[in-house]
Structures are given as structure tokens and as C-alpha cells.
């Protein structure tokens, strides 16, 4: 296993060292190192998805660790029923992968500009990274993998239940989401994530971290906007 990881074009040698910026990020780094699965939720902009992908990449590129691949899972809302579109699955999902393409570029040392622009595709090509829609998970088992479920506020309880029961041997899972950014319309679907969090909160295998406005690292502009949005009570359900 170590030899296979070492011989991949993109490996641990090019992964940059990234340290936590906020206290809550440090909690995630520390509990992940102790073997905990993660449920990260709260304000937009604290780096939930970024640090999840980084920690996952760090794990799968560790020559001594058993996980061999990162699997990004996301619901393709508002087009959940993407099977009706006359294109293949990769084309349908391409738009939803743009944020991850941007993120992974900053996790690795780049010898040239071309390497910077195609890093995501090369990780997929060498079998280190996969992207899957929630529509295509039933019946699968993920062994030797780190599963990252992003934008999980757009996934109902039934789908969350399906996803977490895909976790196989020598695998771990991370959930990232923001209750305030859900695209789900029905109350019972929105409540599904809250119920799911209650279950994970009882599991010793999980660390659940809520990020607040004070954790925002995207920009001071975003922090100011959210502070005033909350102060005025606008867009709050």
C-alpha cells in the first residue's frame, strides 16, 4: 500500500503544511488526529469544506495510513433527478465540482501554472479523488476511504442514512453543512439533518463542531454581512 501511494504522480511530497487558524478549526484538527469522524456545521466561510478535504488528503497520502482515496459526496440540488438530462453523469456533476477544483489547488506545491490548473483532474485520474452524487450510492460500500459529505443541509434524512451506512472497513466520514443555507423546501426534510445530528452527537466515534461568525476566515466582508443580517433578523426562519 505504501509503495502504491508513493508511486502516484501526486503524493505526500507535494502536499503543503496547513495549520488551523481558529480555535474551532484546531478542535477539528485535533479530534481528527485522534481518530474521530467529523460533523462540521454553522456559519458560511469558516473553511469547513477546505479543512475537511485537506485532512482527508493528508490521511490518504500518509504512507502508513490505510485509507487510499477521498470520496466527495454531494446532492445535486436543485437537479436531484439528473437522470433525465441527455448528458452523462460526469457532465451533469461538473458544475458542482468547481469549488473543489479551486480548493485542492492550494493544498499542493505547484511546479508550474499548468499543474495548478489541472491538479483536481489529476487527483481523480490517479484514483486518489472521486466525486459522487447522492443519487448513485445505494448498494455501494466504501472501504479504505475518507468520505466527505458536503452541503449536507441539502440532503434529507433518508439520504443521510443511506450515505453513512456505506462506510466500510478502514474508512472514515466527514459531514459539512450550514442549516441556514438549505435548498430543501419541506419542513420534515429540513428537520432531517437536525435529527441526524442528534444521532451523531450520541456516538463516541464523532466530533461535532459548530462554527460561528467569529470563525469566518473567508473575509471580513462576509463576516460583516452576516453580523448585520442576523442583527436585522433578515432571511432567518
Ranges and model annotations:
Residues 1-8:
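Interdomain "pre-motor" coupling segment immediately N-terminal to P-loop NTPase/helicase cores
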Residues 39-43, 50-119, 184-202:
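Conserved P-loop
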Residues 196-237:
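Conserved coupling/interface region of RecA-like P-loop/ASCE motor cores
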Residues 34-40, 144:
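Pre-Walker A (Motif I) flank of P-loop NTPase domains
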Residues 17-35:
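Pre-Walker A adenine-sensing motif
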Residues 45-46, 75-80, 137-138, 154, ...:
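Conserved nucleotide-binding/hydrolysis micro-motifs of P-loop NTPases
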Residues 124-162:
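Conserved RecA-like ASCE ATPase "motif II neighborhood" in helicase/translocase motors
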Residues 72, 131, 148, 172-178:
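Structural recognition of the conserved hydrophobic beta-strand(s) that form the central parallel beta-sheet
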Amino acid at each position: 500500500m505504501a509503495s502504491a501511494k508513493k508511486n502516484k504522480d501526486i503524493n505526500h511530497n507535494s502536499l503543503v503544511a496547513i495549520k488551523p487558524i481558529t480555535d474551532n478549526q484546531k478542535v477539528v484538527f485535533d479530534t481528527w488526529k485522534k481518530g474521530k469522524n467529523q460533523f462540521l456545521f454553522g456559519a458560511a466561510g469558516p473553511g469547513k469544506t477546505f479543512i475537511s478535504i485537506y485532512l482527508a488528503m493528508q490521511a490518504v497520502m500518509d504512507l502508513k495510513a490505510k485509507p487510499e482515496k477521498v470520496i466527495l459526496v454531494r446532492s445535486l440540488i436543485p437537479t436531484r433527478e439528473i437522470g433525465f438530462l441527455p448528458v452523462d453523469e460526469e457532465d451533469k456533476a461538473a458544475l458542482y465540482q468547481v469549488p473543489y477544483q479551486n480548493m485542492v489547488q492550494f493544498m499542493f506545491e505547484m511546479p508550474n501554472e499548468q499543474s495548478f490548473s489541472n491538479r483536481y483532474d489529476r487527483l481523480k485520474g490517479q484514483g486518489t479523488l472521486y466525486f459522487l452524487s447522492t443519487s448513485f450510492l445505494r448498494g455501494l460500500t466504501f472501504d479504505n476511504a475518507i468520505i466527505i459529505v458536503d452541503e449536507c443541509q441539502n440532503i434529507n434524512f433518508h439520504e443521510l442514512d443511506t450515505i453513512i451506512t456505506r462506510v466500510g472497513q478502514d474508512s472514515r466520514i466527514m459531514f459539512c453543512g450550514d442549516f441556514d443555507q438549505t435548498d430543501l423546501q419541506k419542513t420534515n426534510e429540513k428537520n432531517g439533518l437536525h435529527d441526524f445530528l442528534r444521532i451523531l452527537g450520541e456516538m463516541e466515534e464523532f466530533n461535532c463542531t459548530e462554527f460561528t461568525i467569529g470563525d469566518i476566515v473567508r473575509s471580513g466582508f462576509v463576516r460583516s454581512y452576516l453580523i448585520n443580517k442576523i442583527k436585522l433578523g433578515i432571511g432567518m426562519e
